[in-house]
């Protein structure tokens, strides 16, 4: 499946690059052959560009294992999107315009996206509804794709409300367990003491890697946690269920997992712009705008440089494509000729909501055309 992008390009080239002929098989010359040729080239490129955009939309959904684009409105996104340091860091440092085509190395990607960071929001659990009927925070569901031995980092982020005067805050994270004979229902995970000064509220992170790994090994032990953060006057500062004006302050888990890219061979090709008169196989610029699709579920990038391949692959280019020429010489009637296709593609990093309203930061392979060639 990882060769899908290449096959799509081969198909598109064959469809749009066949020379027009008359019904009797003879070519129809015109007085402005050169001008018409340039116009035809522009038309070919425009068709290729449109087809490339449609192919990208299909590939993204397929590689993310989504049957359709998640139906999440901008208002819902505003409520769910944490206004927290790790998420803002991902957005601020986003490498959306990377173009490493000058680098001769290639990444040999698998077909499906690889996950690097998962931001999981809490959900309600029946076990967390206490005797008084009030739900307690928090319960986190985890994807079966997360393997405990691949977890590099796991942090619980909580938002502490602002204070009016300097105070010491005692933070306690408790893990819920099945009731013991003595009635115990909690066991401690982390406790910490921190000083807060007047001003805006703050985000605080707590390492929960060991707890997460245990949950992944034994899913039945994941009954949820309770968060407490009291100041010196006994006021609970932890935002567990955001009130008015507290959108984006939900607790959440930030999980980072390993990802080991592979390297492959070197390749070279031509680069052109939209005004180029180059007839040979060439890479042309193409920017994909997700906002134009109405894909609000993609947090970042909002747009990226995808590029596309277009141009002719003639057998006269022997010094550039010797292997194809040898095949044609051995079987001239059995070869359909070389097609202009990507010979180097690289991934893009994407921050997005999946169908379960989880925020995923992952790498989608083969989404940027870095090199074009004839094959």
From Swiss-Prot:
Q: Which GO terms describe its biological process?
A: muscle cell proliferation; negative regulation of myoblast proliferation; negative regulation of satellite cell differentiation; negative regulation of skeletal muscle satellite cell proliferation
UniProtKB keywords: Cleavage on pair of basic residues, Cytokine, Disulfide bond, Glycoprotein, Growth factor, Secreted, Signal
Glycosylation: which residues?
71
Alphabetically, the GO molecular function entries are: cytokine activity; growth factor activity
Q: Where in or outside the cell is it found?
A: Secreted
For this record, an example GO cellular component is: extracellular space
Specify whether Cytoplasm is a keyword of the entry: no
Q: Which residues form the propeptide?
A: 24-266
- According to its UniProt record, where is this protein mainly located? secreted
Among Gene3D superfamilies, the record links this protein to: 2.60.120.970, Cystine-knot cytokines
In the UniProt record, does the keyword Secreted occur?
Answer: yes
The family database entries (InterPro entries) matched by this protein are listed as: Cystine-knot_cytokine, TGF-b_C, TGF-b_propeptide, TGF-beta-rel, TGFb_CS
Q: Which SMART domains match?
A: TGFB
Summarize the protein's role.
Acts specifically as a negative regulator of skeletal muscle growth.
- Record-stated family: Belongs to the TGF-beta family.
| Listed name of the protein | Growth/differentiation factor 8
- Origin organism is Excalfactoria chinensis (Blue-breasted quail)
Q: Which gene encodes it?
A: MSTN
């Amino acid at each position: 499946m990882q060769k899908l992008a290449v096959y799509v390009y081969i198909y598109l080239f064959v469809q749009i690059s066949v020379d027009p002929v008359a019904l009797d098989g003879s070519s129809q010359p015109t007085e402005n052959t050169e001008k018409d040729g340039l116009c035809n080239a522009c038309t070919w490129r425009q068709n290729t560009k449109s087809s490339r955009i449609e192919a990208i939309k299909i590939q993204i959904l397929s590689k993310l294992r989504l049957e359709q684009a998640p139906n999440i409105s901008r208002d819902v996104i505003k409520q769910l999107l944490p206004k927290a340091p790790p998420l803002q860091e991902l957005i601020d440092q986003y490498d959306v315009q990377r173009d490493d085509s000058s680098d001769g190395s290639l990444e040999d990607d698998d077909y499906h996206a690889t996950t690097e960071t998962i931001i999981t929001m809490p959900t309600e659990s029946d076990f967390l509804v206490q005797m008084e009927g009030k739900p307690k925070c928090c319960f986190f569901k985890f994807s079966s794709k997360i393997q405990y031995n691949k977890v590099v980092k796991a942090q619980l982020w909580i938002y502490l409300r602002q204070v009016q005067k300097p105070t010491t805050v005692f933070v306690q994270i408790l893990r819920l367990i099945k009731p013991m004979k003595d009635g115990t229902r909690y066991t401690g995970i982390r406790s910490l003491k921190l000083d807060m000064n007047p001003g805006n509220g703050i985000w605080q992170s707590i390492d929960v890697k060991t707890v997460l790994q245990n949950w992944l090994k034994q899913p039945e032990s994941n009954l949820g946690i309770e968060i407490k953060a009291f100041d010196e006057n006994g006021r609970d500062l932890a935002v567990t269920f955001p009130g008015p004006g507290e959108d984006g302050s939900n607790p959440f888990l930030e999980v980072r997992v390993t990802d080991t890219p592979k390297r492959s061979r070197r390749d070279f090709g031509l680069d052109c712009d939209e005004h180029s008169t180059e007839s040979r196989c060439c890479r042309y610029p193409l920017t994909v705008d997700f906002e134009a699709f109405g894909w609000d579920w993609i947090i970042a990038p909002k747009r990226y440089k995808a590029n596309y391949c277009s141009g002719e692959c003639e057998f006269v280019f022997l010094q550039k494509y010797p292997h194809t020429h040898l095949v044609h010489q051995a079987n001239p009637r059995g070869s359909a000729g070389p097609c202009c296709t990507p010979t180097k593609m690289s991934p893009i990093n994407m921050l997005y909501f999946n169908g379960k309203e989880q925020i995923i930061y992952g790498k989608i392979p083969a989404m940027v055309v870095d090199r074009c060639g004839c094959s």
